[in-house]
């Protein structure tokens, strides 16, 4: 897309906003320019406004405290219009005029909250006041309190509709005017412009709001220098439904945080046009008193902002920040429609949530595909896409009753809190008797003869970390037995680093991933770069680049034929199909002795590529004295191929048919076979 096209799109959005939204958006953008750019823009603006006498006259009126104080004699509609047109022109340092503005603004806000009139105008006035350089920290704290109260009242069921004709507000805090407003005059646009359907500034502050107002501390109730304090509001008969609190009470921060997250008023649609937030990193939650699951440990929601940003849906972070992980996973288009999310956005969100539900089936397809020799680069790219999605630590309470009751003395302990919240307290229970699903894969059993442990159980539904770890084991096996690829190894190591810092993975899973990392790093050191041939000549075109930001749907990764045509490493034809070798059987080796599988003449030199049951796991994969050892054999002919060249260091000659197997290759084969021998008792098989 050309630059002029991008500018055109931005201009079309800009035209769809009202003047207040345009101002806030421009200020947000100006915060990102350099001082030179800012000065240049200032010169341009001063030059263009030099001959505008009208704006100079308007600015003079806006900074006259005497003129502003006389506005209280005007009608309510005119006062609101005057405030909107003059408040942006207030000069910083003019404390006298500012006090008059704040005093008048208090009355407008009090009237708007009680009578449900001028709601849109009140939003805009608050937005101007909160970002205005003339307001102080105390001013913004008090204004933020008004903002919270306005939002609280609206969330309780108010609607921005014209008031009934019989409504007439009378009270001690009524601000004067020669005539009451007619019903049709309740909310006209300012400067003779009709109100826009989505023309408002969101309640939550964006980055354009000074940081001081983003946290309402202990001085939240501090009055302004001009002694502005929220006045008690009298209950009006037109307020249906009414607010739960008493008419003269302000809601406490606890009450604000306890409100339901899904009672957003229908006048505040969460559309891109109505939001001035420009990135997921900006402040999207309500003022500090409300719930924010993005910051809760073990919530599984910490990665939601970055995930939404990758989908270009970061403007809806405020909606997700009020949800739990389970609520997010059950979102539907109907619910999003009730929150007034635009049609296109809610359809995209619903599709993205559906793909989150399909992650486990995608991972299972990936596991099968890697076993069948699929394109390793594509599998790594899919794993990269999955790891950036929101993933919650699996709780044992999510497992089936069979899994929960499987020989554990304390079935509720791991599920009482997120597994990684207090990892130190769980280490002992994991080492003694780990749950099969939660802590996959556990440490290997001490001896293969121990038949007291059950066979490796399938990963429980919803246990994304375990399923992800399982696929990572398959990929590690593939890396160990195939020609080394620097890009694949780098991508794999990046994935492991993300997993090691992710709260959803258990300590046992992280230890396993760390051992695989060490194994791959050892492999990288074993094969010097200069010993490898030109990798680009062997790597076929990687044409399956991720152009979209969403995950592939389930089933799209199981196309073995398409994958095998894009294989980036040479695979010799198999002497026996995988099914006959029993590599995909539940026991892992299908009844065929690993020793026989290694020494069988029928496999020949081609069978070596099919040893998918390697245990890439660190020290646990090394030969031990308690296990049967595999003797050296001469039944595997060695071919002088690029694969063979890469498998040996430069100082070790390539063996011929009559030589012993190189110790490096032998060590790898021993590691694979030792894992296969212990597969029945060690539930860490990567098959």
Swiss-Prot record:
Query: Would you tell me the Gene Ontology cellular component terms?
Result: cytoplasm; nucleus
| Residues recorded as bearing Phosphothreonine in the entry | 400
Q: Where is the composition biased (Low complexity)?
A: 175-190, 200-211, 278-290, 448-461
Query: Where is this protein localized, as stated in its record?
Result: Cytoplasm; Nucleus
Top-level taxon of origin? Eukaryota
Query: Can you provide one Gene Ontology molecular function annotated for this UniProt record?
Result: mRNA binding
Instruction: Please provide the Gene Ontology terms (biological process) for this protein.
Output: cerebellar neuron development; regulation of mRNA stability
Task: Read off the Pfam families from this record.
Answer: SAM_1 (PF00536)
Q: Which residues carry this modification: Phosphoserine?
A: 172, 271, 278-279, 281, 548, 550, 556, 585, 593, 621
- Keywords from the UniProt entry: Cytoplasm, Methylation, Nucleus, Phosphoprotein, Repressor, Transcription, Transcription regulation
Where is region (Disordered) located? 160-301, 402-464, 600-636
Q: Which residues carry this modification: Asymmetric dimethylarginine?
A: 595
Biased-composition ranges for Polar residues?
215-224, 617-636
Basic and acidic residues bias: start-end ranges: 160-172, 424-435
The record lists the membrane-crossing segments as none
Q: Which SUPFAM superfamilies match?
A: SAM/Pointed domain
- Cite the SAM domain residue spans from the record: 299-372
Family of this protein: Belongs to the SMAUG family.
The protein's role, per its UniProt record: Has transcriptional repressor activity. Overexpression inhibits the transcriptional activities of AP-1, p53/TP53 and CDKN1A.
Its recorded name reads Protein Smaug homolog 2
| Organism per entry | Mus musculus
The record's gene field reads Samd4b
